[in-house]
């Protein structure tokens, strides 16, 4: 029986909080469970993480694997915890050293082939990490340019779970698909996809556009509410900053 740990960061709106992830590998029938108030996309991380680790040359334990997300009282959303879950399982199974992730945050969504995909909300995550005195963050390679906006935090980019294993001193057997390089090349210098359009393309929505213009010009906070399909995402994607 062994326990592996890793740190991640959760978001509720723009409020960030540290998530401690512990993986427990124990005797029993093969089963992988995630507890600690995960949402649907995070619960589905079981299949993503297992497949991604196997694609990195890691032999998944033929035993019971339990992953706990703490604090249990806080809801955890999204797929940005995938890589940290993988790291905790790898640590529990002895594929990487137990102490190599101490004081390091791990972020990233993983694909079934082991590639690490970019995440959203990196800036508030990094600012919170800096406030908590955490100096190192392992993140998707495609997010590195965005990470440079926050000084005093060391950002380490990985493109594959296998690179994380090697970074932590373990042995990995993997190949980064060519499609990954093509996608990363299209992302551009900022590590983010360009805006899909211009505000001038939006018909109507005069009050909403005026509010966005005022917020962008003055650097003010802005919250948009309303039912799905009313144009919140469309307007936000066309707002600079």
Where are these regions (language model features)?
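Peripheral, non-AAA+ core regions of ATP-driven protein-machinery
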Residues: 1-234, 239-240
